[in-house]
Protein backbone atom coordinates (compact mmCIF):
# COMPACT_ATOMS: atom_id res chain seq x y z
CA UNK A 1 0.00 0.00 0.00
CA UNK A 2 1.30 3.46 -0.92
CA UNK A 3 2.21 5.87 1.86
CA UNK A 4 1.79 8.82 -0.48
CA UNK A 5 -0.19 11.60 1.25
CA UNK A 6 -3.69 12.22 -0.04
CA UNK A 7 -3.96 15.35 -2.14
CA UNK A 8 -6.48 17.95 -0.94
CA UNK A 9 -7.48 20.97 -3.02
CA UNK A 10 -8.52 24.13 -1.14
CA UNK A 11 -10.27 27.17 -2.60
CA UNK A 12 -12.73 29.89 -1.58
CA UNK A 13 -14.42 33.08 -2.78
CA UNK A 14 -12.95 35.58 -0.30
CA UNK A 15 -9.50 35.48 -1.90
CA UNK A 16 -6.22 33.62 -1.43
CA UNK A 17 -5.26 35.99 1.41
CA UNK A 18 -8.36 35.52 3.58
CA UNK A 19 -8.31 34.53 7.24
CA UNK A 20 -10.93 31.84 6.73
CA UNK A 21 -8.89 30.18 3.99
CA UNK A 22 -5.79 30.20 6.18
CA UNK A 23 -7.76 28.61 9.03
CA UNK A 24 -9.04 25.86 6.73
CA UNK A 25 -5.58 25.18 5.30
CA UNK A 26 -4.09 24.90 8.79
CA UNK A 27 -6.92 22.58 9.82
CA UNK A 28 -6.54 20.09 6.97
CA UNK A 29 -2.77 20.26 6.38
CA UNK A 30 -2.03 17.41 8.83
CA UNK A 31 -4.38 15.19 6.81
CA UNK A 32 -2.68 15.29 3.42
CA UNK A 33 -0.84 17.26 0.76
CA UNK A 34 -2.69 20.57 0.50
CA UNK A 35 -2.84 22.66 -2.66
CA UNK A 36 -4.46 26.11 -2.60
CA UNK A 37 -5.92 27.60 -5.78
CA UNK A 38 -8.05 30.63 -4.92
CA UNK A 39 -9.14 33.96 -6.43
CA UNK A 40 -6.68 36.84 -6.35
CA UNK A 41 -9.39 39.17 -5.02
CA UNK A 42 -12.75 39.19 -3.25
CA UNK A 43 -15.27 37.14 -5.27
CA UNK A 44 -18.19 36.80 -2.85
CA UNK A 45 -21.56 36.15 -4.51
CA UNK A 46 -19.85 35.31 -7.81
CA UNK A 47 -22.02 32.19 -7.95
CA UNK A 48 -20.96 29.64 -10.59
CA UNK A 49 -19.70 32.09 -13.21
CA UNK A 50 -16.79 30.93 -15.36
CA UNK A 51 -14.59 33.09 -17.57
CA UNK A 52 -15.11 32.08 -21.21
CA UNK A 53 -14.43 35.41 -22.92
CA UNK A 54 -11.08 36.47 -21.49
CA UNK A 55 -7.79 34.78 -20.65
CA UNK A 56 -7.00 33.76 -17.08
CA UNK A 57 -3.71 34.19 -15.25
CA UNK A 58 -2.25 32.08 -12.46
CA UNK A 59 0.28 33.47 -9.98
CA UNK A 60 2.25 31.15 -7.71
CA UNK A 61 2.24 32.89 -4.33
CA UNK A 62 4.36 30.22 -2.66
CA UNK A 63 4.80 26.47 -2.93
CA UNK A 64 1.46 24.78 -3.71
CA UNK A 65 -0.40 28.11 -3.23
CA UNK A 66 -1.80 29.85 -6.32
CA UNK A 67 -3.87 32.98 -6.99
CA UNK A 68 -6.11 33.15 -10.08
CA UNK A 69 -7.53 36.33 -11.59
CA UNK A 70 -10.89 34.64 -12.05
CA UNK A 71 -13.94 33.31 -10.28
CA UNK A 72 -14.08 30.56 -7.66
CA UNK A 73 -15.35 28.13 -10.30
CA UNK A 74 -12.44 29.14 -12.56
CA UNK A 75 -10.07 28.24 -9.73
CA UNK A 76 -11.51 24.76 -9.31
CA UNK A 77 -11.52 24.20 -13.07
CA UNK A 78 -7.90 25.29 -13.55
CA UNK A 79 -6.69 23.36 -10.53
CA UNK A 80 -8.28 20.05 -11.50
CA UNK A 81 -7.89 20.28 -15.28
CA UNK A 82 -4.46 21.92 -15.43
CA UNK A 83 -2.35 22.33 -12.31
CA UNK A 84 -3.25 18.93 -10.82
CA UNK A 85 -4.42 17.09 -13.92
CA UNK A 86 -1.72 14.40 -13.66
CA UNK A 87 -2.44 13.66 -10.00
CA UNK A 88 -5.96 14.77 -9.19
CA UNK A 89 -7.01 15.60 -5.64
CA UNK A 90 -9.04 13.02 -3.75
CA UNK A 91 -11.05 15.77 -2.04
CA UNK A 92 -11.78 19.46 -2.51
CA UNK A 93 -12.70 21.84 0.30
CA UNK A 94 -13.83 25.45 -0.03
CA UNK A 95 -13.93 28.17 2.63
CA UNK A 96 -14.06 28.89 5.41
CA UNK A 97 -16.42 31.58 4.12
CA UNK A 98 -16.73 34.87 5.99
CA UNK A 99 -20.51 34.61 6.38
CA UNK A 100 -23.42 32.21 5.99
CA UNK A 101 -24.25 30.08 2.98
CA UNK A 102 -27.63 28.84 4.12
CA UNK A 103 -30.89 28.30 2.25
CA UNK A 104 -31.02 30.34 -0.98
CA UNK A 105 -27.50 31.67 -0.32
CA UNK A 106 -26.19 28.62 -2.16
CA UNK A 107 -27.53 30.02 -5.45
CA UNK A 108 -25.24 33.06 -5.12
CA UNK A 109 -22.31 31.64 -3.19
CA UNK A 110 -18.88 31.51 -4.76
CA UNK A 111 -17.75 29.30 -1.88
CA UNK A 112 -20.35 26.68 -2.74
CA UNK A 113 -19.72 27.16 -6.48
CA UNK A 114 -16.02 26.34 -6.13
CA UNK A 115 -16.90 23.10 -4.35
CA UNK A 116 -19.67 22.39 -6.84
CA UNK A 117 -17.29 22.81 -9.78
CA UNK A 118 -14.96 20.34 -8.14
CA UNK A 119 -17.79 17.86 -7.70
CA UNK A 120 -18.92 18.38 -11.31
CA UNK A 121 -15.38 17.47 -12.36
CA UNK A 122 -15.52 14.26 -10.35
CA UNK A 123 -13.81 15.33 -7.12
CA UNK A 124 -15.95 15.00 -3.97
CA UNK A 125 -16.17 18.40 -2.30
CA UNK A 126 -17.18 20.18 0.90
CA UNK A 127 -17.99 23.89 1.32
CA UNK A 128 -17.49 25.44 4.78
CA UNK A 129 -19.02 28.74 5.97
CA UNK A 130 -18.99 30.59 9.29
CA UNK A 131 -22.38 32.12 10.09
CA UNK A 132 -21.29 35.54 11.35
CA UNK A 133 -21.12 39.13 10.10
CA UNK A 134 -18.31 40.39 12.32
CA UNK A 135 -15.85 39.17 14.96
CA UNK A 136 -15.02 36.07 12.95
CA UNK A 137 -13.69 33.28 15.16
CA UNK A 138 -12.75 30.47 12.81
CA UNK A 139 -11.36 28.13 15.46
CA UNK A 140 -14.55 26.10 16.13
CA UNK A 141 -15.24 25.79 12.40
CA UNK A 142 -11.66 24.76 11.71
CA UNK A 143 -11.87 22.02 14.34
CA UNK A 144 -15.07 20.69 12.81
CA UNK A 145 -13.58 20.91 9.30
CA UNK A 146 -10.56 18.86 10.34
CA UNK A 147 -12.75 16.16 11.87
CA UNK A 148 -15.15 16.01 8.91
CA UNK A 149 -12.35 15.97 6.33
CA UNK A 150 -10.55 13.25 8.27
CA UNK A 151 -13.73 11.19 8.23
CA UNK A 152 -14.25 11.86 4.52
CA UNK A 153 -10.71 10.77 3.68
CA UNK A 154 -11.07 7.53 5.62
CA UNK A 155 -13.79 6.16 3.34
CA UNK A 156 -14.36 6.16 -0.42
CA UNK A 157 -16.70 9.03 -1.32
CA UNK A 158 -18.83 9.20 -4.47
CA UNK A 159 -17.01 11.28 -7.12
CA UNK A 160 -19.78 13.91 -7.39
CA UNK A 161 -20.59 14.15 -3.68
CA UNK A 162 -21.11 17.74 -2.47
CA UNK A 163 -21.66 18.84 1.13
CA UNK A 164 -22.56 22.35 2.29
CA UNK A 165 -21.47 22.98 5.89
CA UNK A 166 -22.47 26.02 8.00
CA UNK A 167 -20.94 26.61 11.43
CA UNK A 168 -22.71 28.93 13.90
CA UNK A 169 -20.56 31.90 14.88
CA UNK A 170 -19.86 33.16 18.37
CA UNK A 171 -20.47 29.81 20.08
CA UNK A 172 -18.93 26.39 20.48
CA UNK A 173 -21.33 24.30 18.35
CA UNK A 174 -23.41 21.67 20.12
CA UNK A 175 -22.60 18.95 17.62
CA UNK A 176 -23.90 18.78 14.07
CA UNK A 177 -27.09 17.93 12.19
CA UNK A 178 -27.54 16.52 8.68
CA UNK A 179 -30.07 18.94 7.24
CA UNK A 180 -32.12 19.97 4.25
CA UNK A 181 -31.86 23.36 2.56
CA UNK A 182 -34.04 25.97 4.24
CA UNK A 183 -35.60 29.22 3.05
CA UNK A 184 -34.85 32.79 4.08
CA UNK A 185 -34.88 36.42 2.95
CA UNK A 186 -32.70 39.50 3.43
CA UNK A 187 -35.45 41.99 2.59
CA UNK A 188 -34.59 42.70 -1.08
CA UNK A 189 -33.32 46.19 -0.32
CA UNK A 190 -32.29 48.69 -3.01
CA UNK A 191 -30.45 51.82 -1.82
CA UNK A 192 -30.34 54.71 -4.31
CA UNK A 193 -27.67 57.42 -4.16
CA UNK A 194 -26.27 60.10 -6.44
CA UNK A 195 -22.66 60.69 -7.41
CA UNK A 196 -21.03 64.18 -7.57
CA UNK A 197 -22.01 64.46 -11.24
CA UNK A 198 -25.67 63.88 -10.54
CA UNK A 199 -25.80 60.32 -11.82
CA UNK A 200 -27.74 57.76 -9.80
CA UNK A 201 -26.17 54.57 -8.52
CA UNK A 202 -27.52 51.68 -6.48
CA UNK A 203 -26.55 49.23 -3.76
CA UNK A 204 -28.55 45.99 -3.64
CA UNK A 205 -28.80 43.45 -0.87
CA UNK A 206 -30.64 43.87 2.40
CA UNK A 207 -30.20 43.52 6.13
CA UNK A 208 -33.73 42.54 7.23
CA UNK A 209 -32.88 38.86 7.71
CA UNK A 210 -35.67 36.38 8.32
CA UNK A 211 -35.74 32.62 7.92
CA UNK A 212 -38.65 30.22 7.81
CA UNK A 213 -39.12 27.69 10.60
CA UNK A 214 -38.73 24.53 8.52
CA UNK A 215 -38.16 21.32 10.50
CA UNK A 216 -34.85 19.70 9.65
CA UNK A 217 -33.51 22.78 7.85
CA UNK A 218 -30.01 24.24 7.86
CA UNK A 219 -31.36 27.54 9.22
CA UNK A 220 -33.03 25.88 12.21
CA UNK A 221 -29.91 23.88 13.03
CA UNK A 222 -27.64 26.93 13.03
CA UNK A 223 -29.84 29.69 14.46
CA UNK A 224 -32.18 27.83 16.80
CA UNK A 225 -30.08 24.89 17.94
CA UNK A 226 -26.56 26.40 17.59
CA UNK A 227 -25.38 23.29 15.76
CA UNK A 228 -23.35 22.79 12.62
CA UNK A 229 -25.51 22.02 9.60
CA UNK A 230 -24.30 19.52 7.01
CA UNK A 231 -26.43 19.58 3.87
CA UNK A 232 -25.86 17.23 0.92
CA UNK A 233 -26.44 19.02 -2.40
CA UNK A 234 -26.90 17.70 -5.93
CA UNK A 235 -27.08 19.07 -9.45
CA UNK A 236 -30.58 17.88 -10.38
CA UNK A 237 -32.69 21.06 -10.26
CA UNK A 238 -35.84 19.63 -11.83
CA UNK A 239 -38.93 20.45 -9.76
CA UNK A 240 -40.49 16.99 -9.94
CA UNK A 241 -43.50 18.12 -7.95
CA UNK A 242 -44.43 20.56 -10.73
CA UNK A 243 -44.29 18.02 -13.55
CA UNK A 244 -47.93 16.93 -13.04
CA UNK A 245 -48.99 20.62 -13.04
CA UNK A 246 -47.60 20.95 -16.55
CA UNK A 247 -49.23 17.79 -17.88
CA UNK A 248 -52.38 19.66 -18.87
CA UNK A 249 -50.64 22.54 -20.60
CA UNK A 250 -50.93 23.02 -24.33
CA UNK A 251 -48.83 25.54 -26.25
CA UNK A 252 -50.84 26.78 -29.23
CA UNK A 253 -49.39 25.81 -32.58
CA UNK A 254 -47.09 23.09 -31.24
CA UNK A 255 -47.60 19.37 -30.72
CA UNK A 256 -46.94 18.02 -27.26
CA UNK A 257 -44.91 14.80 -27.00
CA UNK A 258 -44.20 12.55 -24.06
CA UNK A 259 -40.60 12.49 -22.78
CA UNK A 260 -38.32 9.64 -23.75
CA UNK A 261 -38.90 6.64 -21.50
CA UNK A 262 -42.25 7.87 -20.12
Swiss-Prot record:
Binds 1 divalent metal cation per subunit. A divalent metal cation binds at residues 13-14, 44, 97. Its cofactor is a divalent metal cation. It catalyses: a ribonucleoside 5'-phosphate + H2O = a ribonucleoside + phosphate. One of its GO terms (molecular function) is metal ion binding. The keyword Iron does not apply. It is found in: Cytoplasm. Its EC number is 3.1.3.5. InterPro entries: SurE, SurE-like_Pase/nucleotidase, SurE-like_sf. It comes from the Bacteria. One of its GO terms (cellular component) is cytoplasm. Its main location: cytoplasm. Keywords: Cytoplasm, Hydrolase, Metal-binding, Nucleotide-binding. Belongs to the SurE nucleotidase family. HAMAP family: SurE. PANTHER family: 5'-NUCLEOTIDASE SURE, 5'_3'-NUCLEOTIDASE SURE. Nucleotidase that shows phosphatase activity on nucleoside 5'-monophosphates. This is 5'-nucleotidase SurE. It comes from Myxococcus xanthus (strain DK1622). The gene is surE.
Amino acid sequence: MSNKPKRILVSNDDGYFSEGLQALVEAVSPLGEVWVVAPDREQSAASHAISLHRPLRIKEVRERWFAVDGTPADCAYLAINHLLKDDRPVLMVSGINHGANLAEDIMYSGTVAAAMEGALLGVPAIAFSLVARRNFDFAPGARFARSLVSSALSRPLPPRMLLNVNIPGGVEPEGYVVTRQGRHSYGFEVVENEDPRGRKYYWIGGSDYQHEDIPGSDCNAVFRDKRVSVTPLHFELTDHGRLPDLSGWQVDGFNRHEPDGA
